[in-house]
Amino acid sequence: VIFLGGVSNDPMAEFSPSENFIQNAACPAYLSYESKRAGVRRFIYASSCSVYGYTVDELYDEKSPTTCSYPYGISKLQGENGVMHLADDKFSVIALRQGTVCGHSDRMRFDLVVNTMFKNAMTHGEITVNNPSIWRPIFHIQDACSAFIRSIQAPDNISGVFNVASDNYTLGQIGDIVGAE
């Protein structure tokens, strides 16, 4: 089972904190519990690198402290906790802490930093970068698909939390790259 559902960003989480908690924390915990009860061998949870909060000075790995104080990141961490405690030798649980996804799709999301910059460059001829020194893990949609496929194909005894991103950039670097395109 791959859980891709839930509230997808900070503004939506802040708009409806209770719905955010239900969709990002309670639902994956319940679905993973029912999956295990039904004999499913693996549960994959689409988490987020937002669990680390925002940083100017550091890059994070899976052992880094989770310091998010925003409802979205908190709910994704609660979702991880809700699914990970079910892992055992008969039920593998993988949580993928995804970077900010970017890339072309049939249903473009223009609330994502790279996609927003491209849209603004194309429609307004300019890119605005606030806080250019903030680091963001960026995750191309093709790399995201590969991460989920590899999670499906992983040996049965693999469980854990994994950061997945294509690369790390500052918002200023992203603006420069988009501007050069």
Predicted regions: what they are:
Residues 124-125, 129-181:
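C-terminal substrate-binding subdomain of Rossmann-fold SDR/epimerase-dehydratase oxidoreductases
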Residues 11-19, 54-58, 106-107:
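Conserved catalytic-core motifs of eukaryotic protein kinase domains, centered on the activation segment
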Residues 1-23:
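NAD(P)H-binding glycine-rich loop region in Rossmannoid oxidoreductase-like domains
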